[in-house]
Design a protein with these regions (language model features):
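Active-site-proximal mixed secondary-structure blocks
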Residues: 1-121
C-alpha cells in the first residue's frame, strides 16, 4: 500500500520527533473499510508489531501484515488508516485484535471514535 503526501505541508522534523518516541512496540492498525457487502462501511483492524518509519522525505511508514490478510484488504480499500500505539496497560486490546476472526468480533466491546479521516481510534 503506497500513498503520496504533499510534502510541502509536511514537517519532517515533527515526524522525526514523533517516530523517535516510538523505538518499538505494538500497534493496532485500523481503517473504515468501504461498503462491500451492502451492510455499510465497517471498521477493520489488526495488531501489528512491525510498525516502523521508512522515510522522512517523503514521509513514509511501513508495517508487515500476515500474507493473505482479509483485514489488510479492507485497509487497502480504505482511503486512510490510523496507527493506534498501545501502552503496556492495553494487552487486552493487543490480543483481541491479534486473533483471527471477523472484524465485528474484534471491535465488540471496544470503545472507539472516528478520527477526522474516519478511521477508528
Amino acid at each position: 500500500m503506497s500513498d503520496t503526501t504533499d510534502s510541502t505541508a509536511f514537517d519532517s522534523g515533527h515526524f522525526r520527533t514523533i517516530m523517535g518516541h516510538f523505538p518499538t512496540g505494538v500497534t493496532v492498525i485500523t481503517a473504515m473499510s468501504p461498503d462491500v457487502d451492502g451492510t455499510g462501511p465497517q471498521p477493520v483492524g489488526f495488531t501489528i508489531g512491525s510498525f516502523t518509519s521508512v522515510s522522512l522525505d517523503p514521509p513514509l511508514v511501513g508495517f508487515l501484515p500476515q500474507l493473505g490478510s482479509s483485514t489488510m484488504d479492507g485497509i487497502k480499500a480504505s482511503s486512510s488508516f490510523c496507527v493506534n500505539v498501545l501502552s503496556d496497560q492495553q494487552s487486552d486490546l493487543c490480543w483481541k485484535f491479534a486473533k483471527s476472526g471477523t472484524e465485528t468480533t474484534r471491535f465488540d466491546g471496544v470503545e472507539w471514535h472516528a478520527a477526522p479521516s474516519g478511521a477508528p481510534v
